[in-house]
Amino acid sequence: MFNVNREYISKKRVIYNLYRRERANKMVEVKELFKNTEEYINKEVTVGGWVRSIRDSKTFGFIVLNDGTFFQPVQVVYNDKMDNFQEVSKVNIGAALIVKGILVETPNAKQPFEIQADEVFIEGESTSDYPLQKKRHTFEYLRTISHLRPRTNTFQAVFRV
């Protein structure tokens, strides 16, 4: 068999888990951002969630991110100054991301604020055939993908009642 240094692998796994736990402890829920906006405006925040929609151009892009804690998602603006701009631009709907950036007010836009991203970590990929797309889905269709129903707006609203 192969001579594997199990102690080295174990230490690496412990360090990685500590790193992830540290990031998770500093994350803010989307619900918290909407309830206490003034507390977070012009400050650095870290938010995690799933991509609801993504649009990009050559120099910047927009991600609509939802973590399931609030009915309204948060918009993330990212630009080509990020190291992984190309990777983030290719992310599909349903991918899990952790975004670190500055929360900025947007008084003339639909949403009250957005996150100007400094870093975007791709925690989990999603394929292009992910069944929940931006469009509205019928209940009949949602019955066929019962494991993903909690990620839809309709079922999130029902669960909050």
Language model: regions and residue ranges:
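Class II aminoacyl-tRNA synthetase catalytic cores and aaRS-like
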Residues: 17-161
